[in-house]
Structures are given as structure tokens and as C-alpha cells.
Curated annotation (Swiss-Prot):
Name assigned to this protein: Peptide chain release factor 2
Any matching Pfam family: RF-1
SMART domains noted in UniProt: PCRF
Subcellular location: Cytoplasm
Family listed: Belongs to the prokaryotic/mitochondrial release factor family.
Gene Ontology, cellular component aspect: cytoplasm
UniProt keyword list: Cytoplasm, Methylation, Protein biosynthesis
One GO molecular-function entry: translation release factor activity, codon specific
Gene name in the database record: prfB
Natural source organism: Campylobacter jejuni (strain RM1221)
Function: Peptide chain release factor 2 directs the termination of translation in response to the peptide chain termination codons UGA and UAA.
Main location: cytoplasm
């Protein structure tokens, strides 16, 4: 990097921070934080626990947003002032240090962008994720299990907690179906970018001739709904099936019909849950999953309407990403256009940067 490139980078980053400031309005956030502080000092504030919880979440979210903005603004100002000073004194050592720190400065601004992009109504919620293999039997089942492991590793890296809601093993390998709840700050905000069809190209370990195979799996992500969001489901629109749980569970397995499957006729959505020994609890969880999926479907419809009839790029039916393991190694996201060669790292859950690239590119559109 040289002086010209660094000065151009500073211009670009200042422009970004200026645009973000015009959207988030830091002065309005400060005013709102003062209002919340006054509310919290009122004796009656804590009598409504539910409302206090809602305001508490808002406070955490906007405090983090303001903190990220101030960090980015200060880091950029400091770098700009130091650059001018080092230039005027021809201080090559300081200039070299600034050039070396440029990626870190860009990361600080990206952090601000992401925190702005994850300030939507549902982004802070937990996420319900379901993975379904496409046609192709064992090969697709194996691909679904690779994706499942990728998300589990991602959750580990981010400190998210995972609770399995439903797991059905494949007959020879992999899995037929899995649903799990991801708990953590902005779990849905990040994972919503994974909604869609994931394509794998590789030489199949299940093909003795070693031919190249293409497999597909769909990933569906919806926000876990708070109890105060009401979704009406009519009895005539659903069918509830009870069946015996499969998979791990010791002697309890296959003895009682504790697993629950709900089919929603108008949309064709099917959800199932077998993570608890209690049929009653599994039924309650399955209804929660169905409500979340219906809510997500409604969000997509609204997004499509807002896009003047164009299809949203975050959707269950879109092919969003290709993972090519043969004849070359590359993961390419269809929405951001970014390609990555560190395939092993990505399949080991190192997907945060890739997801952030998607969120930024979708916002830019």
C-alpha cells in the first residue's frame, strides 16, 4: 500500500461512516438512551415486567450500535489525523504502521455496518433452522449432515447455544431431516442469510466409479417468536400425526408415540419435533416451529412486495451458494458474488465473513 491508496481508502471509509450516521442518527440514539434512563428511574417502570424486558432489549441493542459507531468514527479520525501528521513530517515508520493496520481499520467499519444491518425487528431473536436433503438419496443425505455440522461449528465459534428439535438419520449415511433452535444475540440476524438451496459438487464417496455428483439441500431459517406475537392457525388447516421417536434415546425409543408432525395444508409446510419424551411438550414445540415458519413466510411476502414484485434474494426456493470440491475447490455465494478457496475452513463453520458479505451486498441493492 502507498500514500495514494491509503488516502483513497480513508475517503471510502469516511463516506461509509457518513452514510451510516445519516441512517442511524447517533444524536437520536443518545436522546433515546436518556429517555430510557429516566423511565428506569421511575418506581412504576419495573411493575410491568414484560414491558421492562422489551425496553431492556432495545437499550442493549441501541447501546451496542452507538458504541460500534463511536469506535469506528474515532478510529477513522485518529488514523486520518496521524496520516496527515506523518505525511507532513515524512515519517515513513508511522506511515508503514498505518498501512499495516489498514485491514484492521476496515474490519472496524465492517463491524459498524453489520451492527446497523442487524438492527431489524427480528434480527436479535433466536433462530429455528431446518435442513432438508434434496433428491439423490445417500449422497444428498450426507450433504445435509455436512451442512448441519458446519452450522454447529459456526454456533460454537459464535458462542450460540444449540438445541436439537428433530433429527432423522439417513438409512446409509447422513440425515433425512434435522431442525434445531439456535439461541444467542443476533442468531436470526446472521442465519437468515442461509435461507435457500445449497449446492455441492464433488466426487462421491458412495460411488465406486468415483464419478462427479451434484447434490442439493435446502436450509430454512425462521425467527423464534415471542409469546406476544399471535399467529392464528385454524384447526381445519392442519393435520397432526403422532409417531415413535427415532435416533438416540435409549430404551425409550420406539416405545411411545411421543414424536409429533404437523402438516399445514394451505402452505404445504411440515414441521416435526421429537426432542422430548413428552408428547405434550413436543406438540407445543412443533406448533411454535410452525408459527415461526408462517411468520417467516409472511416476512418474505412483504419483502417481495417492497421490492416491487421482484423476488427476494433471501428465500427458501433460491439457490444461494455453491460448494465445489472437485475438479477445483471453491465456495461461491450467488448473492454477494464473493468466492472463497478455503473450503475446509468454511465447512468447519468459518462462515461469519461470508454471511456478513451477503448482508452488506443485499443492503447495497
Amino acid at each position: 500500500m502507498d500514500n495514494y491508496e491509503f488516502s483513497e481508502l480513508l475517503k471510502t471509509l469516511k463516506n461509509k461512516v457518513g452514510n451510516i450516521a445519516s441512517i442511524i442518527k447517533p444524536e437520536n440514539i443518545q436522546t433515546r438512551l436518556k429517555e430510557i434512563e429516566e423511565l428506569e428511574n421511575s418506581p412504576s417502570f419495573w411493575s410491568d415486567v414484560k414491558q421492562a424486558g422489551v425496553i431492556g432489549k432495545e437499550k442493549t441493542k441501541i447501546t451496542n450500535l452507538l458504541k460500534n459507531y463511536e469506535n469506528a468514527f474515532n478510529a477513522l479520525n485518529d488514523a486520518s489525523e496521524l496520516f496527515d501528521l506523518a505525511n507532513s513530517e515524512n515519517d515513513t515508520e508511522t506511515l508503514e504502521a498505518l498501512f499495516n493496520d489498514a485491514p484492521k481499520l476496515e474490519d472496524t467499519i465492517t463491524s459498524l455496518e453489520i451492527s446497523m444491518l442487524l438492527s431489524g425487528e427480528n434480527d436479535g431473536k433466536n433462530a429455528i433452522v431446518s435442513i432438508h436433503p434434496g433428491a439423490g438419496g445417500t449422497e444428498s443425505n450426507d450433504w445435509a449432515s455436512i451442512l448441519y455440522r458446519m452450522y454447529l461449528r459456526f454456533c460454537e465459534r459464535e458462542g450460540f447455544k444449540v438445541e436439537t428439535l428433530d433429527f432423522q438419520e439417513g438409512e446409509e449415511a447422513g440425515l433425512k431431516d434435522v431442525s434445531f433452535l439456535v439461541k444467542g444475540e443476533n442468531a436470526y440476524g446472521y442465519l437468515k442469510a442461509e435461507n435457500g438451496i445449497h449446492r455441492l459438487v464433488r466426487t462421491s464417496p458412495f460411488d465406486s466409479a468415483g464419478r462427479r455428483h451434484t447434490s442439493f439441500s435446502s436450509v430454512m431459517v425462521s425467527p423464534e417468536l415471542d409469546d406476544d406475537i399471535e399467529i392464528e392457525i385454524e384447526e381445519k388447516d392442519i393435520r397432526i400425526d403422532y409417531y415413535r421417536a427415532s435416533g438416540a434415546g435409549g430404551q425409550h425409543v420406539n416405545k411411545t408415540e411421543s414424536a409429533v408432525r404437523i402438516t399445514h395444508f394451505p402452505t404445504g409446510i411440515v414441521v416435526q419435533c421429537q426432542n422430548d419424551r413428552s408428547q405434550h411438550k413436543n406438540k407445543a414445540t412443533a406448533f411454535k416451529m410452525l408459527k415461526s415458519r408462517l411468520y417467516e413466510l409472511e416476512l418474505m411476502k412483504q419483502q417481495d412486495s417492497a421490492n416491487t414484485g421482484e423476488k427476494s434474494e433471501i428465500g427458501w426456493g433460491h439457490q444461494i451458494r455453491s460448494y465445489v470440491l472437485f475438479p477445483y475447490q471453491q465456495v461461491k455465494d450467488n448473492r454477494s458474488g464473493e468466492a472463497f478457496s478455503q473450503v475446509d475452513n468454511i465447512l468447519d463453520g468459518d462462515i461469519k465473513k461470508m454471511i456478513e458479505g451477503v448482508l452488506i451486498s443485499l443492503k447495497a441493492e
